[in-house]
Amino acid sequence: MRTKEQAEELGIPLTTLDEYSVLDVAIDGADEVDPDLNLVKGGGGALLREKMVEVCAKKFIVIVDETKLCDGLGPGFPVPVEITPFCHMHTLRLIGGLPSLAGCTPKLRMGSSSSNQPDGDEIAVTDNGNYIVDLEFTEPIKDVPKAASELKNTVGVVDHGLFIGMSTAVIIAGSDGVYVKK
């Protein structure tokens, strides 16, 4: 929403995915990138909208600095999950019981949906009117595709911040310069 407001203030024309459902390219950042170019995204709370844009793109290019690279997704950045407000505590318990997420601690995000840090006493609400659960891991997720599938098939889960096999290329800024992984 902030980007939309800034674009309007600057007179930049906007359109919608309903009008143009195929994009040549989408460019975005990521919270974590594993060696297979799987991603954790949505730390800012817009994971569903981000995923909807990326699936409409013929190419999805990710730009990160080298601190976002990891050996396995999970322990470096909480995995956000967007859930419905209705029966949200039940959904939280279901997520906590998923076999592929053993060892994770699901926590309802409090405060601003755009911060993965508690910055208020109210439950964080997304632009879609849903809640965010942050999954905190001490070990990397062992089977990322299975975790993504189990989350997606959990009643009450709208979507998750695991972006599996979606990136075409990752542009990485590091201490030795910029390089691309495909």
What does each model-identified segment do?
Residues 2-182:
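Conserved phosphate- and dinucleotide-binding cores of soluble alpha/beta proteins
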